[in-house]
Design a protein with these regions (language model features):
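Nucleotide/phosphate-binding catalytic cleft detector across ATP-hydrolyzing
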Residues: 1-138, 157-172, 192-286
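Short, glycine/acidic-enriched loop or turn micro-motifs at the edges of active sites
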Residues: 123, 145-146
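Short, basic interhelical loop/turn and adjoining N-cap
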Residues: 185-189
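Phosphate-handling catalytic cores of nucleic-acid transaction enzymes
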Residues: 141
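Short beta-strand scaffold segments in enzyme catalytic cores
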Residues: 148-152
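Short glycine-enriched loops at secondary-structure junctions
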Residues: 144-145, 246
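Long, charge-rich alpha-helical interaction segments
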Residues: 175, 179-182
Length: 286
């Protein structure tokens, strides 16, 4: 399942119970807005609460029992994987078991049996081994909401010394674009409108605003490619796998014919999560 990461807490019942988590006496409306950037996800309970929502949504989707045991398969950036792995596992695998909460007025009783952690980006390649076949080196560029994570794989193995995290995520592009549209046209376009125009999808909008958004999108992609090069990677020398929410934007502006890089695109925003699930299934099959 995929949903916006916004989370707003209330002491009193909101006007609707749609997308509402009830946990330890408080109400949390999920999916409105987005999380602020935090260096450490364990610094507050937001990601734990979002995990409970994700579990409930997955159970609804699968029509499974609301009283059940689960194993969580989650990811961390490879650049901080070793440093944060144990703390994040303990953050999700709490002593309070089973966890009881209400989601959309339905009671859930969940026992989190284990937490499996995997490196983001690399796990998605478990779904696409063909991108690594016969390639001694491949660069992975994961364009997320807040950061762009870089990693080179040599002989299909992540090279930890090459990991970089750049604060150039799509959210920065969207915020800067919204401000520029407002200054130049007086229009307060929404984040959703900007995303649709950046992906070249249909959206009714004044042509001047559309032009500004598309121009900012082009400049944003140029900044990413420049930052990757400045980080010591030669985009023309090795194939580059672009993934994450921003890869759909980049694909509209960069092709192999441009001779800027040798791009391959994974546009599925669920690729990391599906990769984690695939790896856990392989572990069980042994």
């Amino acid at each position: 399942m995929c949903f916006p990461t916004g989370l707003t807490g209330y002491d009193y019942e909101p006007y609707t119970m749609q997308n509402v988590l009830q946990y330890q006496g408080k109400y949390y409306v999920c999916g409105t807005g987005r999380q602020t950037l935090v260096k450490n996800k364990t610094s507050n309970d937001n990601y734990y609460l979002l995990t409970l929502v994700a579990i409930a949504e997955e159970i609804k989707h699968r029509k499974a029992e609301r009283k059940t045991e689960v194993i969580l398969a989650v990811g961390l950036p490879l650049s901080s994987f070793g440093r944060e792995k144990q703390g994040f596992r303990e953050y999700l695998l709490r002593k309070e078991q089973p966890v009881r909460f209400l989601y959309e007025s339905e009671l859930y009783e969940i026992t989190i049996k284990d937490v499996k952690l995997f490196p983001q980006g690399y796990s998605a390649l478990a779904l696409h081994p063909e991108y690594l076949k016969n390639e001694p080196s491949v660069l992975l560029v994961d364009i997320g909401g807040w950061t762009v994570d870089l990693m080179r794989l040599d002989n299909a193995v992540p090279n930890a010394a090459t990991c970089r995290s750049l604060e150039l995520g799509v959210i920065r592009c969207i915020d800067e674009t919204a401000e520029q549209v407002r200054r130049n046209t007086g229009l307060s376009v929404t984040e959703t409108q900007i995303e649709r125009v950046l992906r070249r999808e249909s959206c009714s909008m004044a042509e001047e605003a559309r032009r500004i958004i598309q121009e900012n999108g082009r400049k944003y992609i140029e900044r990413i490619l420049s930052a990757v090069t400045e980080s010591g990677f030669d985009l023309r020398a090795v194939p580059t796998v672009f993934m994450g929410g921003g890869s759909a934007i980049l694909k509209r502006h960069v092709t192999a014919q441009d001779a800027i890089c040798r791009p391959v695109f994974i546009e599925d925003v669920h690729a990391n999560a599906t990769g984690y699930e695939r790896i856990v299934e392989q572990m069980w099959a042994r």
